[in-house]
Amino acid sequence: MDASAIKLTPKDIVSQLNEYIVGQNDAKKKVAIALRNRYRRSQLDEEMKQEIVPKNILMIGPTGVGKTEIARRMAKIVGAPFIKVEATKFTEVGYVGRDVESMVRDLVDVAVRLVKEDRKDKVKDEAVKKANDKLVKLLVPSMKKKANQNAGNPFESIFGGMMPNFGNNDEEDEEPPTEDIKTKRSEIRSQLLNGQLEEEKVRIKVEQDPGALGMLGTNQNQQVQDMMNQLMPKKKVEREVPVKTARKILADEYADELIDHETANQEALELAEQMGIIFIDEIDKVASNNQGGGQDVSRQGVQRDILPIVEGSVVQTKYGSVNTEHMLFIGAGAFHVSKPSDLIPELQGRFPIRVELDSLSVDDFVNILKEPKLSLIKQYEALLQTEEVTVNFTDEAITRLAEIAYQVNQDTDNIGARRLHTILEKMLEDLSYEAPGMPNAVVDITAQYVDDKLKSISTNKDLSAFIL
């Protein structure tokens, strides 16, 4: 995790969020304060630190207005482990389905990946050097030792190589390189480092992914799979790949060997406990709607299972136990049918910060198309530029696109900013199809162009074909 990122002030965090997300300033402000409070807590003495727990956030707003994106970007800014789960995927204890503790295990998996990627990045140069050394030996191999060919496994001559050769080391089976081979390797090394051999084919041994077990329930499946992976020896298969691909594979393997996995796992557990963010989407779907019946009872059961995780409990993972007390939980939902007050009182109390996100207006759609650092307009311009087609959007065209997207949302299901993907894809459909045959073309997207391509939905109220 970036140590400097956690020291960002709330204004700095909001400023960075503004580069990717339009509007919703109240939501940005609240998540920025929650993030800053984590830094403040880290500066306190141990006794006070243990008493301060995160103030969880409940985001209320329709789909497509930025709830998930705000939380995801916030986590990315500080390198915190983040997962998004859907409350409707969980079932009460004793029923078939995912148990609520799986969200914590998934978060720890993300934390482990983040920590190991960070550590691998620190030993990247050494790993690449080792990979290049190995590639040189593969491109200019030494003679094999014939006398010891089957010395590693006496059963190999009987079973024809079907037995795993434990402890076999290819380099130990090679004769010391002759002067001629040393000279060739020196020449190959120079060519390799100069990038002249990137497309050359080379045969390497790579670890084979173990097959998944499909006959068990989700959580049971994962636990048994993890246990089997630890018990079974790692099987390697030979593949022929280009040098540039082989370097990546070998460098990753060497980096994996260079890092201390035990301390990395412990660091990941600490990171998940202190900086983890769990985004629980569709939490309104497990709220009781006061209609009674078995469905309400089942929903309350899921809420009561989520409650101890949010309150703080110890969950066992394959890396060790992790305490959820200081994790930040962000609940989100549209709350069209139910209200936040329909959640059980204990769970309501665990989400003390409420923020309502606004529905998107035409002006919001215009800003979404123009302002973000990697806006949709810029994405489509970049995609078509790969075909040497230059696309220019006029301000009038962008406004017209925003008006159509807003109108479609009003006339059908409101899916927020996601509607822009549908509209843009439909408008640029013909151009994307013809682009490979239009080198060096320049296409101006005007309001008239937008109307011509989208007249079927801008004038026709039967918009069912455009509902995502």
Swiss-Prot record:
Binding site for ATP: 22, 64-69, 281, 346, 418
Signal peptide annotation: none
GO cellular component terms listed in the entry, alphabetical order: HslUV protease complex
Cystine crosslinks: none
Function: ATPase subunit of a proteasome-like degradation complex; this subunit has chaperone activity. The binding of ATP and its subsequent hydrolysis by HslU are essential for unfolding of protein substrates subsequently hydrolyzed by HslV. HslU recognizes the N-terminal part of its protein substrates and unfolds these before they are guided to HslV for hydrolysis.
Family: Belongs to the ClpX chaperone family. HslU subfamily.
Name of the molecule in the record: ATP-dependent protease ATPase subunit HslU
Organism of this sequence: Staphylococcus carnosus (strain TM300)
Gene for this chain: hslU
